[in-house]
C-alpha cells in the first residue's frame, strides 16, 4: 500500500528495526503495509518487514505497533528461520481454501483428510512457523527493542491481549471454536504470552504515542477492499466483476484476492477462476483435474443449466477418503467469452445439496449496485459529553455484534468508562 498510513507505518517500523542490531541504517529496512483484511505480520531476512492494515488497525498506540514489528524483526535477528526444522511454509494469509480445509480445523475426519489433499488454491503470502521457544524469544526481543526505542514495553502484553480478544470475536462471529490466530500464536497460548510479556516488561516507563498513532492510521481501509470484493455477513459482492452470491445459512465467508472461501460445520468450498477457452464442460473437467495431485477426481457426469440467465455447468465426484465417502462438486459459470468462475465444494457424501441455494444465488449486479459498494474505513473520533459505549458502538458499520467489535477494536471492556475528549476508533462507510 501507499499513502499517509503506509508512510507512517514505515517510519515506525524502521525506527524499531534499527534497535535490533541487524543494521544501524534505517534505509537498510523495507517496511510495507499490506492491503489485506487479515491480522498478520512477518519479516524475512534482508530487512523486509510486513504488517497488514487490518492488524495495524487493531493496535491502539504506536508502542503496540512497534512491538508487533519488533517481534517479527526479532525472529530474523535470532535467525529463527535458519534454525527451523522445516522450511518456510506457504500459508494462506488471504483466505485460501487449503487452510480452511486443513486437518487443523477439521481434525482427522474424512472431510478434513481429503480437504488437505485436494484444495491448494487461493492467494498466499509467506508466513513462518516457529517453535514455542522461538516465539517467546521473539516476544522478549520485541520488548527489548521497545525499551531501547523509549516505548512503553508493556505494549507487547496489551497487543497480545487485543489479538486474543479479536480471535475470540472472530470465532464467535463464525460460530467456531476459539482458534489461535496466525500471528498471535504459533504454539504458546495467548494468555500465557500476555502474562510472560507483562512480567518481562516490568515497570519500565516509556511513551505510547497514542495520539500520533491514531492520526497516522486514521482513514485506513478496514476489512475487505472493494477491488477484491466485499463480504457482508453471508453475502459476497464484487463490484468489478459485477457479481454477487449468498452463502448458505450457517456458513461464513473469507475473502482473498484470488479466492473466496466458504466454510461451515458440514462442508467447505471456495469461489475461484481459471483459464477459460469457451467450453464450460471442458472447464469443469479441467477444474476437477487440478483439485488433486494425489487422486484422480472424475465427475459422474457434467450437466449444463442457466442460473439467473448465466450459462452454467456442474458435476459431482464421490471420493473414498479412508474414513468415508465425500462429495466434491464443481459448479461453473460463464462470465464472458473468455472468463468463467466456479465454486468447488466438499461435503460428506449425500450432503452436497446444502450448497444448492448458493449455486443458484449467483447473479450479475447492476451498475448502480456496483457503484453503491463502499469500503469500510477506520475513523478516529473524539468522545463528547453524553457519549456512551452503546451510542458509539451503534455508529459501527456492522449489524452483527457492533458492541463487541467496538470494544475489541479499542481495547475496551463492557465496564470501561469513557471521558469527554478521549479518542476512540470506529469503523464507518
Enumerate the language-model features and the residues they cover.
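Short, hydrophobic/aromatic-rich segments at coil-to-beta transitions
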Residues: 229-236, 260, 307-318
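Signature of long, low-cysteine stretches enriched in small and polar/charged residues
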Residues: 289-337
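Peri-catalytic and regulatory segments of divalent metal-dependent proteins
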Residues: 1-106, 127, 141-178, 182-183, ...
Amino acid at each position: 500500500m501507499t499513502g499517509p498510513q503506509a508512510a507512517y507505518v514505515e517510519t515506525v517500523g524502521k525506527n524499531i528495526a534499527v534497535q535490533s542490531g541487524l543494521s544501524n541504517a534505517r534505509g537498510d529496512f523495507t517496511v510495507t503495509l499490506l492491503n489485506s483484511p487479515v491480522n498478520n505480520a512477518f519479516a524475512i531476512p534482508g530487512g523486509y518487514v510486513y504488517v497488514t492494515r487490518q492488524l495495524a488497525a487493531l493496535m491502539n498506540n504506536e508502542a503496540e505497533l512497534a512491538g508487533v514489528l519488533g517481534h517479527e524483526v526479532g525472529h530474523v535477528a535470532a535467525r529463527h528461520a535458519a534454525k527451523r526444522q522445516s522450511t518456510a511454509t506457504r500459508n494462506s494469509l488471504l483466505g485460501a481454501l487449503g487452510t480452511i480445509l486443513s486437518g487443523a480445523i477439521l481434525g482427522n475426519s474424512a472431510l478434513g483428510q481429503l480437504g488437505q489433499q485436494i484444495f491448494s488454491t487461493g492467494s498466499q503470502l509467506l508466513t513462518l512457523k516457529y517453535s514455542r521457544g522461538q516465539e517467546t524469544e521473539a516476544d522478549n526481543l520485541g520488548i527489548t527493542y521497545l525499551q531501547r526505542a523509549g516505548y512503553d514495553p508493556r505494549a507487547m502484553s496489551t497487543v497480545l491481549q487485543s489479538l486474543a480478544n479479536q480471535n475470540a470475536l472472530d470465532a464467535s462471529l463464525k460460530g467456531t471454536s476459539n482458534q489461535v490466530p496466525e500471528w498471535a500464536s504459533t504454539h504458546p497460548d495467548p494468555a500465557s504470552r500476555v502474562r510472560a510479556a507483562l512480567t518481562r516488561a516490568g515497570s519500565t516507563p516509556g511513551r505510547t504515542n497514542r495520539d500520533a498513532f491514531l492520526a497516522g492510521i486514521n482513514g485506513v481501509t478496514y476489512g475487505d477492499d472493494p477491488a477484491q470484493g466485499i463480504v457482508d455477513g453471508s453475502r459476497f459482492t464484487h463490484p468489478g466483476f459485477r457479481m454477487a452470491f449468498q452463502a448458505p445459512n450457517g456458513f461464513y465467508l473469507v475473502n482473498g484476492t484470488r479466492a473466496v472461501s466458504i466454510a461451515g460445520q458440514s462442508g467447505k468450498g471456495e469461489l475461484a477462476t481459471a483459464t477459460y477457452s469457451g467450453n464450460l464442460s471442458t472447464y469443469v473437467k479441467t477444474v476437477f483435474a487440478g483439485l488433486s495431485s494425489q487422486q484422480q477426481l472424475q465427475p459422474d457426469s457434467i450437466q449444463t443449466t442457466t442460473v439467473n440467465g448465466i450459462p452454467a455447468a456442474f458435476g459431482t465426484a464421490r471420493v473414498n477418503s479412508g474414513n468415508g465417502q465425500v462429495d466434491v462438486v464443481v459448479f461453473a459459470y460463464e462470465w464472458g467469452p473468455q472468463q468463467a468462475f466456479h465454486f468447488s465444494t466438499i461435503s460428506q457424501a449425500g450432503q452436497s445439496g446444502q450448497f444448492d441455494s448458493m449455486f443458484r444465488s449467483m447473479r450479475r449486479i447492476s451498475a448502480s449496485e456496483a457503484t453503491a459498494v463502499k469500503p469500510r474505513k477506520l475513523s478516529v473520533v473524539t468522545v463528547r459529553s453524553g457519549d456512551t459505549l452503546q451510542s458509539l458502538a451503534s455508529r459501527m458499520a456492522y449489524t452483527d455484534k457492533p458492541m463487541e467489535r467496538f470494544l475489541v477494536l479499542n481495547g475496551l471492556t463492557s465496564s470501561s468508562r469513557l471521558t469527554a475528549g478521549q479518542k476512540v476508533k470506529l469503523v464507518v462507510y
